[in-house]
Amino acid sequence: MRVSLSSLQRFFSSPLSIKQIIEACDHIGIETEIETLLSSSFSSIITAKIIQTLPHPNADKLVVATLFDGKQEHQVVCGAPNCRPDIIVPLALPGAKLHDHEGNPYTIKKSKLRGIESQGMCCGADELGFSHLQKTERGLFEFPANTPLGESACALLADTWIEFSLTPNLGHCASLLGLAREIAHVTHVDLILPQEFSFSPLEIITKDSPSHDTSICPFFCCVKISGVCAETSPQELQQALSQFKQKSINTIVDITNYIMLAMGQPLHVYDAKTVDIDSLHAEKAQEQHGLKLLNNEEVLIPQGTAIICDKNHTVGLAGVMGSGDSSFNETTTDIILEAAYFLPKAIRASQMRIPLHSEAAYRFTRGTDPDHVLPSLYAAIHYIQKLFPKAKVAPIHVLGSIPPSPTLTLRTEMVERVLGVPLSHSQVHEELASLGFTVTPQDQGSLSVQVPAYRHDIREEIDLVEEMCRTQPWKIEKKKAPATYSPLYAFKREIVDFLAQSGLQQFFTCDLLDMETAALHRQETDYIALQGSKHATVLRDSLLPGLLKSTATNLNRQAPYVHAFELGTIYTKKNAQYQETQSLGIILSGEAEELSWVFHERVLSFYSIKGWLERLFRHFYISSKTYTIRPSEHPSFHPYQQADLYLHKHLLGRFGTLHPQLCKKAHIKHPVFFAELSVDSLLHTQKKAIARYQPYPIYPSSFRDITLTVDESVPADALRKKLLSFPSKWLENVSIISIYQNKNPTAQNKNVSLRLVFQNKERTLSNQEIEEEHERLLAMLNEQLDDTKGTIDS
């Protein structure tokens, strides 16, 4: 949300510096960016009042204007359609430097236009670089009538804009009033409401409509106003909108937009000729039907979608956008003005069905203030009456009522336990009261806290504690640790740090899956009982579905590769009991690395994902002797490119190449390699692993290569580990050199080549010693290979 500093200052009892505002936003968790429009780029442009206009004797479309700057008069030839006496405009004197529409600089000089001398130029907003200040049409920029004469025009127009990046939980800040409320609390200044937003109540008629659905819209108001038109907004209103960098459209639309941006309450305008106000209400669509919207887009509204309608037809998609047929237009003279409080979940459901976005929907989905529905409507009505004095306002129709605010119980002991700071009962009471909560003391160290209607993010006791910490973080001086040390948390943190530093991106996916995503991993699913949405009905029992969906999204948006991991909770069923476990998922797809002149193109393979697991194990000092790799038969993986990983004979996880049909189902064209490990089991093993210092060898090593012909079912790594398990003083390492498999489909054997490294750390081994040790190991291995009918070539 982008607003000007000057508009924000109007809500404070005393002015705040830009530094104070930025620091306050940092404390309450709102990101800010500053954009300053400087007046130094223009010179010799002052404010002047047109005191007389005369027709140009030699040109029908030009006038000769006389302007007064408070000290002297200036004669200027002007062709603007709104050049008339008694308005204050920007006057560029000779020597002033401006820019044309293409950005090219030029200098104002004294000149003659059709034989009449012109001592400068009257300027429009676009010529000053402030085109956002007025509607896009040729004409002079008009200052308010009380603007001082002879002042720098650019200095009066220049302002500082602040871009506020709001997180979804801060919907109550999506307005000038909301932002000012938060900043005022942190900076300890009083919040004031400008005069244009403070009005006395108007006549109300409370109605009862059996068709109105309060589960969508608990509070609905509308009013008929006669005698208006779609004329150009006065400069004052255009300038007010410009403080949000909003373009002017027409008077009525500008008023509703300004009220929404300033107070956070969206309003909607209907043409009264097309809408029956007596039957106007909100309901769920009874059947699927089409609707042409304000943006000329035709949509199909599914059954059950929240709509606004009268007894004749649908007039809008509730909380999102109105219909084009009932919209305010150039011929409208009578309007119906609507203000309502829609439940956020109802509008979110509509946007799920129809992916439309609007400023109104942005606010309704995050939650608006039901207490501001009528005040915002009053403000809009009075603004309309100010611009259209002859307009007639009928009584306001009201359906439903304002829902009560939730009341929570807060224990002082809870605050101290979470924050780690000793706080008295009165301190907690005072802090919450200053935040706008209604606090009532209770017995036994607890408080009854009524949440303000605009705070949709406060629903539980812990939210109140978080709010205290968020708004006054500098008061929280840690006197003691708020929680005990968690080995699992520290271990997870180390895994994240290692994998992220090694080049993998961390993904975060939702624990709850929709049916389509869950089906990527399993066919039979258990659905949760209390479903908040049809898009979140299944608890995941693996990280695979979420990671696979995220991978598809990134690759389909032209990402060259996805090398990512996720550390999260999965939910499994064992002996009819559900349990939560921590799981680590690693997924690779696309290119192996970014192409450059240094690296040749390399493709990912089964061994790429295996390599990542080995790097992780080395980081935690888990020896290869402690884990084994065995063939597996999981349906999600390629039948011949998958394996189970066992650690101390306990299943740790599995890895491999995902099944091509699964990749096709997920709309991924590249092979996908995936691994998933139990973090709980990994932590248990890591506790036993000890890093031991190994001095660098000073004596040379020797090696011997052997080739084993074994049954194709024998894992090559099993041979390597078998050799390492034999008692030997000098066998330092065994590595796999190559594996050869006969292309003949009837062949049952394969050749595995191994390299045995021998070394004595205290002296150089003789060739005879190495040969004797080598022969001894081969003899032992021959005995082990009897069952496999393998042979050995050394």
Swiss-Prot record:
Subunit-structure text: Tetramer of two alpha and two beta subunits.
Catalysed reactions, semicolon-separated: tRNA(Phe) + L-phenylalanine + ATP = L-phenylalanyl-tRNA(Phe) + AMP + diphosphate + H(+)
Natural source organism: Chlamydia abortus (strain DSM 27085 / S26/3) (Chlamydophila abortus)
Keyword Aminoacyl-tRNA synthetase: yes
Protein localization: Cytoplasm
Name of this chain's protein: Phenylalanine--tRNA ligase beta subunit
Record carries keyword Disulfide bond: no
GO CC annotations on file: phenylalanine-tRNA ligase complex
Cofactor binding note from Swiss-Prot or TrEMBL: Binds 2 magnesium ions per tetramer.
Alphabetical GO biological process terms: phenylalanyl-tRNA aminoacylation
PANTHER family named in the record: PHENYLALANINE--TRNA LIGASE BETA SUBUNIT (PTHR10947:SF0), PHENYLALANYL-TRNA SYNTHETASE BETA CHAIN AND LEUCINE-RICH REPEAT-CONTAINING PROTEIN 47 (PTHR10947)
UniProt keyword terms in alphabetical order: Aminoacyl-tRNA synthetase, ATP-binding, Cytoplasm, Ligase, Magnesium, Metal-binding, Nucleotide-binding, Protein biosynthesis, RNA-binding, tRNA-binding
